Amino acid sequence: MTTVDSYLCGTSTTPLLHKTIGAMLAETAARYPDGEALVVLHQGVRWTWRELDARVDRLAAGLLGLGLQRGDRVGIWAPNCAEWVLVQLATARVGMILVSLNPAYRTSELEHALRLVGVRALITAEKFKSSDYISMLAEIAPEIRGCAGSTLRLATLPDLQWIIQLGSPRWPSLLDFESLAATDPVSFDDRAISPDDPVNIQFTSGTTGAPKGATLSHNNIINNGFFVGELIEFSAADRLCIPVPLYHCFGMVMAVLNCVTHGSTMIFPSDAFDPGAVLQAVEAERCTALFGVPTMFIAELSHPDFEKFDLSTLRTGVMAGALCPEDVMTHVMERMHMRDVSICYGMTETSPVSFQTRLDSDLATRVRTVGSVHPFIEAKVVDAEGVILPRGQAGELLVRGYSVMRGYWGQPEKTREAIDAGGWMHSGDLALVQEDGNVRIVGRLKDMIIRGGENIYPAEIENFLIKHPDIIDVSVFGVPHEKWGEEVCAWVRARRSIDVDELREYCTGRIAHFKIPTHLRCVDEFPMTVTGKVRKVEMRALEVGMKMEESR
């Protein structure tokens, strides 16, 4: 029998788009001028494509009027709101680079991000939840409080010249966003802007170090958003409910640019995720699609008033960020009417999506795999020497194509570590290609446990343990062992106290003996990055430290 190797290449009869985001927006506004473009329920905003395009022009003129130029970095630090979308599209229209800042950042993370990429102008909310953004900025640069003029000169943030506040500015040194966004439009020659120009800097989640600035071009993200929509058959008739954050590629690429390229309506139910607001928005706005991570769908399904909402208009949507448990997927498809729900996988550095399940994928494919490779993307699974493995064998997943980032801003050595000489982006994920061409993610390369010479993939054990009726969430990692090199440790969030003997009994006969956790700890929460990823490095260090304390 012929062995098929783990190389994949996505094809499509639909060509790549070769245009800037600004040009695409203008096209869509001309094609669907009176179609609803943006609905932001918590702000009472409802704009057509014609209105959105005109508002983008005015804000773009305001940014140019400050003295900002093509290639300048403009940061935005705010939760989901209409202004976020305006800033995204206005900066793209005039060739500036949007720097997406996590609303959960604290002062050290914010200062690192602003300094790393040299942000010249920062657009910020006054506050969000428990964070007072303006006070946090003053903590980094105290001169902000006393500056007389609107052009700043800050010792700690030498590149930052303007801070533009959403709402009434707290101090004279801060500019008013509303005034800036009301600037009379100016003629602007956008022919100098190329689809290959950088348009966005997304910060990696930094599970193993300080976040890096993945630099993405118009070509990267406009095509990725477009093909995410193509694979779920999006059109101008679709109305997308967007509870995912805009600062992340899920919101600004997979949702916003998907809608911009298809003329679909963007509907934001709230400034941060609220399952009740999502359900209400779907019913009131007759949404046809809903995006989210699995935990969002679980929260929506678990809402006490779930059965009271009419979700019958839903057809499709995207789940990403983690594999979805089979029972949850079944409920999403049946109780939420999302028969065409799609699973997406990728990474910030690939704009982000590289794999997606198709509309005809069966249940097993949707819950066990991340689907097949995206159009115009190459992928391969390789061993430690870079040799392509046969299908069915696990190795590192590499991706190449239009979606691969330009690099990490100002960090050429980090870029070379991630993208090899052949243009392949090293994902750091362990994957295997099934015989049918669908891909399974089995873990992280750095998270792989080696016990007595056996390679153990934490994701495999996690996917098994999550089926335990009393386990809510689980994270598996390796801890040092004198004889075996490493042993398996599981941290669980459980509905009741579970001891290691009970867990081992549950596992015995159902998974290989060497995969059964030797150590178990019940916890209330896991250490997380600001983007919601589990910090296994920190968990491992805490576990080792606690074991040392317990042995004394």
Predicted regions and their residues:
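Gly/Ser/Thr-rich phosphate-binding loop
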Residues: 264, 284-292, 301-365, 378, ...
